[in-house]
Amino acid sequence: SSALEVSSFTIDTTAPTLSQETPVTTLTNDNTPNYTFSSDEAGTITYGGGCSSTDNTSVNGNNTITFNELADNTYSNCTITVTDNVSNPSSPLSVSSFRIDTTVPTLSVVTAVTTPTNETTPDYTFNSSEAGTNSYGGSCGSSSTSATSSGLDNVTIILTQPDNSTALSEAQYADCSITVTDPAGNPSTALSVNTFKVDTTAPTVSSTSPTDNESSVSVSENISVTFSESMGTASVTTNTSNTSCSGSLQLSSDSFSSCVQMASSPSSSDNLTFTVTSSPKMFYSTTYKIRVTTAAKDSAGNNIAQSTQTYGFKTSVTFPMTAGSAHSCYMLDNGSVKCWGSNTYGQLGLGNTTNQGVNSSEMGDNLDAVDLGSGIKATAIAAGGNHTCAILDN
């Protein structure tokens, strides 16, 4: 027969050759990441391990595929195989191990900024659930390192102005915040720094009571000092045990060679005005001065400059006790008068001639006060023989 010509055909037993071109970034917060590989043949793509994709055809050259959505995890078993048009499968191409992380760091405050504070570069401590890079918002920056080195650690930073170097000015700060971005690029929710006040101004003495150069002060008068701003209560102290000049609030009649002992520590209802009471009472007709030492500090920790009254104040020259030939009278701190002894001529001022104080039960609170009139007080008293006189405040 005539020769039959067989149609031309090609035998191909060569499998495609694959190589990795652009691996998946690791760490990444992209849970549908891209991956680029090259193939020397076109064909059909199949996937192995923990990865898959809807991209199932390849070309001769570079091929970029997008993996289907992946959960947060480390992927180290993903493979790609290309089968050419005559069913020759390539060797599986191992995708370089990568990690998906879409979890944002969680921040919490550990130690807030003290407020008020006289520290212009105050510390602030917070906790982060992950390591990462710090960034700052609002009116604050930080001169500290920008990295949180490891998760679950407490991180102490030094706050500055937003340029990350200049100390904070005297002001109130209510808008400062911290954000930590983890290595995968996930930013935390901004952590708001507590509102705090920077105060570097020293307090001053606004007023004293008794006032400087005041006279006729009662020997039982309370001693008060009012400051220009809220004070640290622990720093306003006085001497309650002896006559040494200790404590930051002092009272003296001898230019502070010694000081008056006080009945108790200074008291205050507003941290502005502090009051003490001498124990025993002050002496009559004596000049005293009030001094506040540098040990007193405002609530931010700023020490006051020492303040001493220039002239001081003078206590009353009137001695409150007087005596006649057979009776005695005493002017109490509240301006009332009590008398005891012989009352033959009514010299006790009680409107009768009955002797008083014969028995102990008639003394003290049981001893009647002289009726001076409603709301009227005595300012001085004197007695002699069988009479008593008083100067009244009306």
Predicted regions and their residues:
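Conserved structural position at the C-terminal beta-strand
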Residues: 82-84, 180-182, 292
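Acidic, low-complexity Ser/Thr/Gly/Pro-rich repeat segments typical of extracellular/periplasmic
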Residues: 49-69, 138-167, 202-316
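Short, solvent-exposed loop/edge segments of extracellular or virion-exposed proteins
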Residues: 18-30, 108-119, 141-142, 204-216
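A short glycine/threonine-centered beta-strand motif
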Residues: 37-41, 126-131, 219-235, 392
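Flexible, low-complexity linkers/stalks enriched in Thr/Pro that connect modular domains
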Residues: 4-16, 94-105, 192-206, 311-317
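Short glycine/serine- and acidic-residue-enriched loop/turn motifs that recur at repeat junctions
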Residues: 341-363, 387
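Beta-sandwich strand segments
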Residues: 1-3, 87-93, 184-191, 238, ...
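Conserved core positions of repeat-based scaffolds
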Residues: 327-330, 339, 387-390
